[in-house]
Regions:
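Glycine-rich helix-loop-beta junction characteristic of Rossmann-like nucleotide cofactor-binding loops
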Residues: 55-62, 83, 123-126
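Conserved S-adenosyl-L-methionine
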Residues: 68-72
């Protein structure tokens, strides 16, 4: 199923490890979700594919320091971290139950390249990163505003958006959109502060 929809997996050396991690993630999510109601997602496989399909469109291997804003149940950061093993991920999730779940996932999947930060991005001391990712958290401009201090002219934003992406991008210039069905992956550069 995954290799049929994800071309980059054909050349990925650690496929078996990746598939084992997916199976364990799905098992743990099912257990946690029964008690803590973490997510209402019905098709986990589709959401995993959605999380990493961007790797068919662009190479993120040079992004060594990555922030995920509003990590929730780990989409997309957990699955990107499984593939981009030489990158360090900082998952910002203020919800106690979701941050706890992410800590379990980090341990059980042996993801030594992720760090769970149980607070909102805008409340944390900033540090510069190569990539800021977010899926379905907020509109683009407010997300850029709360990311102030975490980005510079070299930083990219990777935003998982729906059909509203073009409305949200009005007035912005340096971006690319990669489309897959309902999903628009927006790769964006911000040259200066918006406000």
């Amino acid at each position: 199923m995954y290799e049929e929809q994800l071309n980059f997996l054909k050349d990925f050396a650690n496929k078996d490890d990746f598939y084992q991690r997916i199976a364990l993630y799905k098992e743990l999510l099912k257990k946690f979700n029964a008690v803590h109601n973490l997510t209402h997602l019905e098709n986990i496989d589709d959401n995993i594919i959605d999380s990493i399909k961007i790797l068919d469109y662009c190479d993120l291997i040079d992004k060594k320091k990555i922030v995920d804003v509003g990590s929730g149940a780990g989409f997309p950061a957990i699955f990107l971290a499984c593939i981009l093993e030489n990158s360090n991920f900082f998952l910002f999730e203020p919800s106690v139950k979701k941050a706890s779940f992410l800590r379990v996932i980090k341990t059980e999947l042996n993801l030594i390249n992720i760090n769970i930060i149980k607070e909102k991005l805008q409340n944390h001391p900033p540090f510069k990163v190569d990539l800021i990712i977010s899926r379905a958290l907020m509109d683009i401009k407010p997300l850029i505003e709360i990311s102030n201090g975490f980005y510079d002219e070299k930083t990219s934003f990777l935003l998982y958006k729906g059909s509203e992406v073009y409305d949200e991008l009005q007035g912005m210039k340096d971006y690319k959109i990669f489309n897959r069905g309902f999903r628009n992956y927006c790769l964006l550069k911000v040259k200066e502060k918006l406000c």
